[in-house]
């Protein structure tokens, strides 16, 4: 099971993950607590990770990049059109996973710690 693209819906305590292989087939649907989330993602083989841009997403993007992942942050308004059914954490993660692979998607630049400290 090699995840090529991972969509992550970030929340305060529980994180929803949706992963697909290189053919776009769903191979991972997982809900993890904060304590298990980072360790799980770090141990994955490097892949493309998509997250909605928010204050905590910049921290996770910097962290996962250090482990070889390619991380892209998407403005929330660009994820919404990809939600296929009722809005849940699982459908959001799936929508993020799909949106991050779109060739014309606009992404948010990952902020450094210094840039975030200014805010």
State what each model feature region is.
Residues 1-119:
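Phosphate- and other anionic-substrate recognition elements at nucleic-acid/protein interfaces
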């Amino acid at each position: 099971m090699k995840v090529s693209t991972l969509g992550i819906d970030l929340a305060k305590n529980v994180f929803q993950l949706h992963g697909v292989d290189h053919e776009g087939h769903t191979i991972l649907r997982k809900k993890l607590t904060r304590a298990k989330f980072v360790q799980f993602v770090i141990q994955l083989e490097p892949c493309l990770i998509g997250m909605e841009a928010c204050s905590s997403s910049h921290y996770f993007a910097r962290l996962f990049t250090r482990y070889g992942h390619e991380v892209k942050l998407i403005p929330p308004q660009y994820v919404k059109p990809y939600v296929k059914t009722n809005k849940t954490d699982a459908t959001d993660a799936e929508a993020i996973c799909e949106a991050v692979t779109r060739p014309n998607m606009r992404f948010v630049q990952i902020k450094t710690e210094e840039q975030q400290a200014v805010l």
